[in-house]
Amino acid sequence: TLNMVADGAYDAFGKADTLFATINLAYVRQRLSLEISASFGSTQTGKSKGDFFTDVSTLHSTAFSLSARWQTKMPGHFLSFGISQPLRIENGHVMVNAPTGRNLSTEAFSFSQAALPLSPSGREIDIEIGHLFQGQNGLSLATNFAYRINPDHNAQAKGAIAFLSHIQLSF
C-alpha cells in the first residue's frame, strides 16, 4: 500500500488494495549477463470515513532497473553497470478538507476542499558501476560507485554520490 499508514484523526480509509506486477527478463551467458526488471502498481483505497481526507484517487506506481555484468579477461574479475528508478508514484491525488475561516459571531468554521498531488516533483534515477573480485578460499571483494539524480524523487535535490564496498571471507 505504498506505506500509506494513518492513525487517529487521519485514519480515513481503513484499507487499501494494491495490484502489483513485475516483469523480469534475463540474458545469461558464460561471460556476460543482462537483466531488466519493470514493476507497475495500482492502489485503490476504500471510501473515506474521516473528515480531513475526503478521497484518494487511484495511485499508479512504477519502478525499473537495467543491469549488465561481464567477466574481464583477468580470472575472478567482473565489471557491472546498472541504471534504475526506485518505486515512484506516477499519478494520484488526495482531497483534503481544510478549515479556511471562522465566523466569530457563531464560532462556526468554514472549510474548503483542495486536491493535493501525491506524485513527487522529480524522478530519481540511480546510475551505478561496480567491480567484483572473486578470489580463492572464499574471498570476495565488491566495490560500487553510485550516482543518484533527483534523490527521493525530489526535483530540487542535489545529486548524491555513494561508494559501497563489501568484503566476504568464507571458511
Q: Positions of the model-derived regions?
A:
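Outer membrane beta-barrel transmembrane domains
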Residues: 1-15, 20-26, 35-157
